Amino acid sequence: MTQSTEQSTLDTYKRLWPYISFYKAGLSVAVVALIINALGDTLMLSMIKPLLDESFGGLDNIESDFLSMMPYYLVGLMILRGASGFVSTYCLSWVSGKVVMNLRRGLFNHFMKMPVSFFDKESSGALLSRITYDSEQVASATSSALVSMVREGASIIGLMALMFWNSWQLSAILLVIAPVVAFSIRLVSKRFRKISKNMQDAMGSVTSSAEQMLKGHKVVLSYGGQEVEKQRFDSVSNNMRQQTMKLVSAQAIANPVIQVIASFALVVVLVLANSEALRAELTPGTFAVVFGAMFGLMRPLKALTNVTSQFQRGMAACQTLFELMDLEAEEDNGKHKIARVNGDIQVKNVTFTYPTKDTPALRNVSFDLPAGKTLALVGRSGSGKSTIANLLTRFYDIDSGELILDGREVKDYQLSNLRDQVAVVSQNVHLFNDTIANNIAYASGDSFSRADIEKAAELAYAMDFIKGMPKGLDTMIGENGVSLSGGQRQRLAIARALLRNAPVLILDEATSALDTESERAIQSALEELQKDRTVLVIAHRLSTIEGADQILVVDDGEIIERGTHGELIKHDGAYAQLHRIQFGD
């Protein structure tokens, strides 16, 4: 292992240690139990010497006390090993479970604090793999790997002590062999760490590919994309297989190499034992104990070689998790907090570029939206309409200019307080795998009564279909409302915004998924909702925004026209052209 890799492993483990040491009581019990379990092998071997030496001249020479007590020693030793094995396994599994749970919670909570721009750049499948696969690798490093390291380490120390106690001359060969074995383990550890990192990335690709197919299953079927997805998944899964085989190959090579090195020690012991100088001093019991202990070292050495790969996988995964946790969370430097804003919005010379793009999405955009008024944004797709809505809620920060709410720049508000002032109904509705009632009252706790939820659903014209559901408002709707139609999902999103009763309302294609009849019904409810509120409407259907106090036409990130519906029609510009296209005038 290179010095940098060693330092990386050490630094990672130092950072992981507080998670483990928090449960030091369980860890201490487990370590003590592991040491007791490991020393059982040493105790078993130590009994060989008195048995052989005392019976060297025949069974009649065996001391009756020792022989009579042997069955009790063996039974007691087996019980002790069994009990210590159970205690160590249970305690370490408990500790590792707690550690992984806290890591997962920490990562999950950190993801919720990350800016939207982070998720624009990252694959959701890869991030899911970090929470699931990578954290499980950490569990291996803190449970089974730690079990092997402590138990086999104690076994090696115990067996070596037994060997030197009985014959330091025969055991001295270990002083030569041990550094060679240690060097070999360091070499394979470097290889294990590199492969483990590649396996994490490969698993992220597998998860991402599978997630894309599952979420886009209807599109795959509609366009006959089965072969495309099959080839994509075949490629990433084969890459995962290749990385796994590289790890297996490294393990398969490392084990016999370590055992061959250790076997030289056995050969040297046999040669030395055959020399006249030592032969006169050795008893059968001494030789059997030393040779048996040296042979017994094979198993823990092999186990330590195997566990090195497991430990390095855990450390590589842990390093990745900590790197994600170290990413800067969404900035929230605002101090201003208010119970309810009036809703007066001013946008002054705002320019904004998405982090993943090179060209600005908005260029020097300016407009005023007085409190209680309605402003509509229209234009072709990709012109920058929804971007303005994202900036009002500070999902992104502007490059230049000013974005003002009630006389204060939005960056001066506490993020949570700012977003409490705004209710958003987007064309991309997200619902949770929960009841209809809990989706409408999402994240509100006990702030709203059942009657409040029903009223919001009524205003959104959602009760018509809710009453037909098996359990009404208590019906589970599946992941992202999979059991509902597009229009039904949109109505629940509108009900959620109605219940929130925020002073600023953003309707981003809010009725795009509704049929004409439902749109008319909801439009009436939305018009009622808009009273005494500041409303920003983003729409393709011009019929929904004809009554707006002001309409802005956005094209390529710039406002090219502004005015009321009548003024823009009279102007006979871009808006009038859009109107003619939609209504066939």
From Swiss-Prot:
It is a multi-pass membrane protein. Its EC number is 7.5.2.6. GO terms for cellular component: plasma membrane. InterPro entries: AAA+_ATPase, ABC1_TM_dom, ABC1_TM_sf, ABC_transporter-like_ATP-bd, ABC_transporter-like_CS, ABC_transpr_lipidA, P-loop_NTPase, Type_1_exporter. Residues 29-313 form the ABC transmembrane type-1 domain. It catalyses: ATP + H2O + lipid A-core oligosaccharideSide 1 = ADP + phosphate + lipid A-core oligosaccharideSide 2. It is found in: Cell inner membrane. Pfam families: ABC_membrane (PF00664), ABC_tran (PF00005). GO terms for molecular function: ABC-type oligopeptide transporter activity; ATP binding; ATP hydrolysis activity; ATPase-coupled lipid transmembrane transporter activity. The chain crosses the membrane at residues 16-36, 66-86, 156-176, 252-272, 278-298. It is an enzyme of class 7 (translocase). Keywords: ATP-binding, Cell inner membrane, Cell membrane, Lipid transport, Membrane, Nucleotide-binding, Translocase, Transmembrane, Transmembrane helix, Transport. Residues 345-581 form the ABC transporter domain. The keyword Plastid does not apply. ATP binds at residues 379-386. Belongs to the ABC transporter superfamily. Lipid exporter (TC 3.A.1.106) family. NCBIfam families: MsbA_lipidA (TIGR02203), PRK11176.1 (NF008381). In MsbA the ATP-binding domain (NBD) and the transmembrane domain (TMD) are fused. Homodimer. Involved in lipopolysaccharide (LPS) biosynthesis. Translocates lipid A-core from the inner to the outer leaflet of the inner membrane. Transmembrane domains (TMD) form a pore in the inner membrane and the ATP-binding domain (NBD) is responsible for energy generation. This is ATP-dependent lipid A-core flippase. It comes from Photobacterium profundum (strain SS9). The lineage of its organism: Bacteria, Pseudomonadati, Pseudomonadota, Gammaproteobacteria, Vibrionales. The gene is msbA.
